[in-house]
């Protein structure tokens, strides 16, 4: 599952971006309750990629939200990568919670005029028979996204079994998505899954992409509006030589 959780902030109307803007810098009592709901959902999955997760700052009550979700949902393994820090106020991150033990994690800064975007590459299994998972949150501008997806393509160029997930901030048939799929052999099993805004979805900017060796059994958007995005869920069948260990 891939989910942009907006630092645990629930948003149900556009006007709340203004009226609830203080929640992006200050703690609020509802945040942990919302995270508990997200943890309950996440507990149904084996691998979860998180975007806009806070790594422990003033606004989150100094709670590392990736760790919190992992513990609440019963995940054994977790990791966060902080891409942008605003003093003690916010530590914007991407995160992984997993039932399987990673064999290697590497953090990458993504190119772009404005810093603060990253990619987390996670390897599972044995060399030569491994699954590579990449969790990303891309820039708002198209030029930066094109650069960032070129970087992602180079990051996975030699890997046969790959899953890329995250908030790409672009649609299925956008030029930047066409570039990535053309460069890598990744595919999107189902196009135009609408995830944003969560209360009236009209844009498909959250994606899970796979290489042909990863067989997709099911993919859907889940109607769990605990953020301003909806989560994307996918069930996959891995090649027989790929073994994930807990």
What are these regions (language model features)?
Residues 1, 7-9, 98-103, 116-135, ...:
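Beta-strand-turn-beta hairpins that frame and shape the catalytic cleft
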Residues 1-4, 35-60, 122, 132-136, ...:
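Active-site beta-strand/loop signature of hydrolases that rely on acidic residues for catalysis
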């Amino acid at each position: 599952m891939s989910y942009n959780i907006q630092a645990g902030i629930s948003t149900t109307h556009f006007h709340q971006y203004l009226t609830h803007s203080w929640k992006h810098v200050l703690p609020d009592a509802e945040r942990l309750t919302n995270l508990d709901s997200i943890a309950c959902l996440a507990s149904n999955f084996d691998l979860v990629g998180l975007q806009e997760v806070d790594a422990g700052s003033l606004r989150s009550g100094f709670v590392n939200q990736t760790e919190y979700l992992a513990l609440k949902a019963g995940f054994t393994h977790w990791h966060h990568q902080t891409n942008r820090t605003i003093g003690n106020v916010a530590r914007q991150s991407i995160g992984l919670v997993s039932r399987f033990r990673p064999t290697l994690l590497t953090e990458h800064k993504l190119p772009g005029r404005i810093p603060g975007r990253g990619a987390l590459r996670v390897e599972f299994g044995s060399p030569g028979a491994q699954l590579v998972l990449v969790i990303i949150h891309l820039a708002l501008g198209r030029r930066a996204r094109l650069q960032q997806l070129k970087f992602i393509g180079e990051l996975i160029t030699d890997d046969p079994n790959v899953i890329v997930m995250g908030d790409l901030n672009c649609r299925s048939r956008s030029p930047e998505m066409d570039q990535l799929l053309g460069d890598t052999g990744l595919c999107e099993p189902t196009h135009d899954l609408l995830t944003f805004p969560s209360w009236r979805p009209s844009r498909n900017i959250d994606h899970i992409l796979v290489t042909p060796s990863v067989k997709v059994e099911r993919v859907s958007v889940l109607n769990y509006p605990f953020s301003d995005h909806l989560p994307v869920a996918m069930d996959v069948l891995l090649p027989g030589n790929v073994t994930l260990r807990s």
